[in-house]
A protein has these predicted regions:
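Residues on a specific face of well-ordered alpha-helices
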Residues: 24, 70, 94, 119, ...
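A compositional/structural signature marking long, glycine- and acidic/polar-rich segments
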Residues: 62-80, 148-164
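Hydrophobic, secondary-structure "cap" segments at the distal end of domains
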Residues: 25-32, 105, 143, 160
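Phosphate-handling DNA/RNA-contact segment within nucleic-acid enzymes
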Residues: 1-75, 91-93
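Hydrophobic alpha-helical scaffolding
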Residues: 16, 38, 58, 62, ...
Length: 167
C-alpha cells in the first residue's frame, strides 16, 4: 500500500505551507463557535463536517507552519489540535508548541486526547462518532497534553527532567 494521503508538490500556484484544507463553511463556523479544530488529514476534516464541526481544517499532513497558524489566528485565538494518535502526530504537536509564540502569545492551543484504540478522527467517525463531543470537552492545554504523553511513555526520571527543561 502507498501513503494514505498523496499531497501535491509545491508549484507556482500551490504552496502547501501556506494553505489549509477546509470546507467553505470554515471561516463562518470558526467565527460562530469561537475556535478552530486542526486535524491531520482530509478525511478527518470531512468526518468532522459530517459530525457538525465545519470549523475544522487540516494542514494536509503534520507539518503545520507559522503561515498556516497566522491564517487561522485572523479568525480566532483558540485552536484545538487533534493530530493522529501516533508518533508523527505527537512530534507535530511538539512543533506547534515551538512555533505558537512566533505567531502570537495570545494563541490558546489545546489538544484533544483521542482514546488509544483510535488512530484518528475518521476512525472515530466510522466506529462511534457520538463520542466526539465528549472528546472535545476533555481537552488539555498543549503543554499539559505533551507532558502527560511524555510521562506515559517513560519512567526514566532523567528523561522526564530533560523533557521539561526543553519545553
Amino acid at each position: 500500500f502507498g501513503p494514505k494521503y498523496l499531497n501535491s508538490s509545491d508549484s507556482v500556484l500551490y504552496k502547501k505551507n501556506r494553505n489549509l484544507y477546509f470546507t467553505k463553511e470554515f471561516i463562518s463556523s470558526v467565527k460562530k463557535k469561537g475556535y478552530a479544530i486542526l486535524v491531520e488529514g482530509y478525511f478527518d476534516v470531512l468526518s468532522l463536517n459530517q459530525l457538525g464541526y465545519s470549523n475544522s481544517a487540516s494542514p494536509s499532513g503534520t507539518a503545520l507552519t507559522i503561515q498556516q497558524l497566522e491564517a487561522i489566528s485572523r479568525y480566532t485565538n483558540k485552536i484545538l489540535l487533534c493530530f493522529d494518535n501516533d508518533e508523527a502526530g505527537l512530534k507535530a504537536t511538539e512543533r506547534v508548541l515551538e512555533i505558537k509564540n512566533q505567531v502570537s502569545n495570545q494563541l490558546e492551543i489545546h489538544c484533544l486526547n483521542l482514546p488509544e484504540k483510535y488512530k484518528d478522527i475518521s476512525e472515530i467517525y466510522e466506529e462511534n462518532g457520538d463520542i466526539f463531543s465528549d472528546i472535545l470537552k476533555d481537552n488539555l492545554e498543549i503543554i499539559e497534553f505533551l507532558i502527560d504523553k511524555f510521562i506515559e511513555s517513560t519512567s526514566d526520571k532523567k528523561s522526564i527532567f530533560n523533557y521539561f527543561m526543553k519545553i
